[in-house]
Amino acid sequence: MSSHLNGIGNIVPMVVEQSGMGERAFDIYSRLLRERIIFLGTPIDDAVANTIVAQLLFLDAEDSEKDIQLYINSPGGSVYAGMAIYDTIQQIRPDVVTICFGLAASMGAFLLTAGTKGKRMSLPDSRIMIHQPLGGAQGQAIDIEIQAREILYIKAQLNQLLANHTGQPLERIEADTDRDFFMSAEEAKNYGLIDQVISRQNLPTAGENVTIVK
């Protein structure tokens, strides 16, 4: 395994495979994509969303019956970009296994709970945080009013979807997301954000379908 610098200065490991045709090098993320594993390991913006959506659509077209594993370590980011990923997860045919490693906060936590019910997971020492959407506006009074209405709409939409995915009453979601609400993996399981806390013994196997936890 070697490594190189990508355009934003991050080190991306390279994997070299040997065959009868010679050597072929892949960056580690492309190699894992062949095993139907996607990584969301950055704040969420339009560029990140476009990449994640493209990978989801590619794997859907390649095999509609095999699970896709989405590993999440993200502090959140753009609500609109996150909703693009969310809607794609809901629309594609394969089950999407979501796995939190490190931190899933804000839109990261929202995408974690958006995975296929029974297949939403977290490593034991991860942290999960939900809160209301952030926003700000400046300009003329009418412009600020327009932005305020949009933020309130997004807040109501996200709260309702969180209630749907977790099984919590909407009133509790509204209260808990009023400020940053941090949870351990076990607390997130009890809350309904995830279905199981995993360890080495039950870590999903690459390329294999995961049994739904009821």
Curated annotation (Swiss-Prot):
Asked if the keyword Ion transport belongs to this entry, the reply reads no
* One Pfam family here: CLP_protease
Localization per Swiss-Prot or TrEMBL: Cytoplasm
E.C. designation(s): 3.4.21.92
Return one Gene Ontology term, BP aspect.
Answer: protein quality control for misfolded or incompletely synthesized proteins
Instruction: Give the main localization category.
Output: cytoplasm
Reaction(s) catalyzed by this protein? Hydrolysis of proteins to small peptides in the presence of ATP and magnesium. alpha-casein is the usual test substrate. In the absence of ATP, only oligopeptides shorter than five residues are hydrolyzed (such as succinyl-Leu-Tyr-|-NHMec, and Leu-Tyr-Leu-|-Tyr-Trp, in which cleavage of the -Tyr-|-Leu- and -Tyr-|-Trp bonds also occurs)
* Keywords, sorted A to Z: Cytoplasm, Hydrolase, Protease, Serine protease
> What one GO molecular function would you report for this record?
ATP-dependent peptidase activity
Question: One GO cellular component from the entry?
Answer: cytoplasm
InterPro entries in UniProt: ClpP, ClpP/crotonase-like_dom_sf, ClpP/TepA, ClpP_His_AS, ClpP_Ser_AS
Q: Where is the active site?
A: 106 (nucleophile), 131
Role played: Cleaves peptides in various proteins in a process that requires ATP hydrolysis. Has a chymotrypsin-like activity. Plays a major role in the degradation of misfolded proteins.
What does the record note on quaternary structure? Answer: Fourteen ClpP subunits assemble into 2 heptameric rings which stack back to back to give a disk-like structure with a central cavity, resembling the structure of eukaryotic proteasomes.
- Family matches, as PANTHER family: ATP-DEPENDENT CLP PROTEASE PROTEOLYTIC SUBUNIT
Q: Which family does it belong to?
A: Belongs to the peptidase S14 family.
**What is the protein named?**
ATP-dependent Clp protease proteolytic subunit 3
Organism for this UniProt entry: Trichormus variabilis (strain ATCC 29413 / PCC 7937)
Species classification: Bacteria, Bacillati, Cyanobacteriota, Cyanophyceae, Nostocales
